[in-house]
Amino acid sequence: GLKDLENYSGDESSYISSNGLRFAYGTFGNKSNPAIILVAGLYNQMVRWPTEFCHDLAARNFFVIRFDNRDIGLSNWMTGLKAPSLVRQMLKYRFGLPVDVPYTLDDMAADTVGILDGLSVKKAHFVGMSMGGMICQIAAARYPDRALSLTSIMSTSGTFGKGKPSLKASMQMLKKPSKGQSRIDNSVEILQFLGSPGYPVSDSVVRAMVELEYARGSNPAGYLRQMAAINTAPNRVHLLNSLKIPALII
């Protein structure tokens, strides 16, 4: 589902208002079909859901929606909000001290539901990866009348000590470009490190995706704000226990 990226150019984004912000989005398929809304992960843009994959879902009689989260890509960047110190915030949160974050995962769940409102979609299958899985968990639980199902991919419930990256993976994710290395080369290296050895993706495909995201809009301060929302999010187990819809964990 990624091979089309090597030959992909341009962007099919439209724009929609939600929760007081402007979001870039794209749709596939007939609007009369059941909707799927795809929510991307931390610092990821909607193109992480490959166009070919979206067309495949549409061919299975779904109306597919993908979009850029706030603070990334072609959606509004929260430039008026200070980029936080992640270390300081995590220490405060762990010791039960008040933490001021620019926005929360609940805000991003409201963004997601607001996009459905803007498209006049009453209900949707919520599908999210990584941070997007967290957002979909909240959206499905907080807005139960809008959710047909939940699919949470490579994500977590927020339970302390569960679903956390290894120290080696954490250090790799924070790795800055080495001397003479471009930001794109560094990003390709990080993504290949994090990728599954069981489902390898060629460097050329990963590079095409990274180059596309950089061309659309890379926002390092947005990464810090999104990460702050993740790091300070409360445990979602009680929310997940309230779900009355089909749920798939991948």
Q: What label would you give each PLM region?
A:
Residues G128-G132, C136:
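Gly/Ala-rich beta-loop-alpha elbow adjacent to hydrolase catalytic centers
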Residues P165-H238, S242:
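Alpha/beta-hydrolase
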